[in-house]
Amino acid sequence: RFTMIYKFLVISCFAASVNLFFAEEINKSNLFDYFDDKKYLSAEFTQRTLQDGYERTVKGTIKAVRDGKFKIIYFEPMQEVIGSDGKSIFRLDYELEQMDVLPQEDYFKNTPISIFTSDVSSLSSLYQISSCDMVENTTVCEITPKSNDAFLEKLFLNFRNFELEELSYTDSFGQTVTLSFYNLSWLSFPNEDLEISIPKEIDIVYH
């Protein structure tokens, strides 16, 4: 079940205050600069996962900060919360009544969530920008991890009308995952928004 952690690390149509320069000129040389002043992310999303001809759709919310912290809430049918305090990964499964706690090791940096939790200099060391092309009024940028042992194979960022509206990726599990964002904001939020409330009946398991 811990592969679920990788499925979500995925993540992440962003806010109102977007620099028009990037809307018009986004390309391989300035893609990561687009995120330079965007320290916070809040959004709702629809996630579609395609594997072996079967597609599953789930909705959720995400909040992330570039100091490594994040919180993702999946609604029905998953009913899970996955988050990080920058040191550990927490996965709360309401159905199992269990929260797993794992160390946030370096290999988590090579997952899609790092687009929103790593600083821009780290993004340049983690990923190689393969292309940024205009496709039907959408700028599609493809990036690949520099690490040979990353579970992520390819990641695509889609920009339209000055905003990043979709993130998709393929991974070593044979999945294609697409996150479509809406009600996205780059504005800051209190640290309390990243806290995970643990019901009394939940068992905590450390790994």
Predicted ranges, named:
Residues 1-3:
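Short, Lys/Arg-enriched N-terminal segments with co-localized hydrophobic residues
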Residues 97-139:
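Flexible, surface-exposed loop/linker segments and immediately adjacent secondary-structure boundaries
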Residues 19-24:
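Sec/Tat signal peptide C-region and signal peptidase I cleavage site
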Residues 43-45, 70-74, 89-92, 143, ...:
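Short hydrophobic/aromatic-rich beta-strand segments that constitute the beta-sheet cores
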Residues 27-30, 34-86:
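N-terminal mature ectodomain segment of secretory-pathway/periplasmic proteins
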Residues 122-128, 133-207:
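Gly/Pro-enriched, hydrophobic low-complexity segments
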Residues 5-17:
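Sec-dependent N-terminal signal peptides
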Residues 61-111, 177-178:
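An acidic-aromatic
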